[in-house]
Amino acid sequence: MLDRCDRVQIAVHDAAKAAQRFGQLLGSIVARRDHSRHLGARRTILAVGESEFELCEADGAGLTQDFLARRGEGLMTAGYCTADLDSMVKRWEGLGVAYDRDAEQLYLSPETTFGLPIVISESTYRPRVGPVSFLYETTNTLATNWRRVAAVYAGLFGLDPARFSEIGSERFGYVGTLTLFDPPNRLDRIELSQVTDDVHAMGRFVKTHGDSLYMCYVEVHDWAAVRGRLLEANARYTPRGSDPATDPDGGWVHPKELHGLLLGISRTGLAWDWSGREELVPSV
């Protein structure tokens, strides 16, 4: 029932300042502004490729203010979309799952989804903006057994476990799976990463926050342009290879550069390399 990764919601102190920074590094533009009752926030919504990043400023007491007080600026909510919100509601009500409907968005609390605050929006076509193509992954870091989480998500969202692709990394210290929604047509998924130690950054994060939302990933159709933006701004990022000035594939932008958001970036199709379909990776 989930079509794709649709958006993220980011808690910020100053949305105008954050919007300028995201535009500088990612070529995003402001699409609109509104208010969220559920989040207790004024939202500045950025068009980032085909996806949207919601910059959320606290508007009095509520979830956004609580997040900022507890964690500071950063990634607050993972967003996905479905073609039929009402069918999703019926599914959850049949399972006895609590949710909140705020205008045309459905929210699940992190207590329901293993530390992963989730918002579901209705699927809609949006023209691509800038050098980013789309958001395709949000990472649910886990102390809980990933197999249990995968089974729960399959039930909650009507996902097919036969499409999932197991993952693991000694470099980053985790095991888990990618809950791919529609392979091989699209990369969209929730990454379930159960940490294997508390030495690596991901493990340290889970030691502090428990089951949680860690980061997100975008695909770019013009990595050279994004890389150039990062270098021109002297923004801290870790390339997939050894040379930040010439790396052909992508990398990770440090949270301090994007108001607390740890952002992974990969060139077109590269992520199939670790998503169970290496044959789909285009050559550079």
How would you label these PLM feature ranges?
Residues 1-62, 99:
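An N-terminus-focused feature that recognizes amino-terminal "leader" regions
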Residues 4-13, 44-49, 54, 64-144, 173-194, 224-284, ...:
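Vicinal oxygen chelate
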Residues 33-35, 58, 64-69, 101-105, ...:
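Short, tandemly repeated low-complexity microdomains enriched for cysteine and small residues
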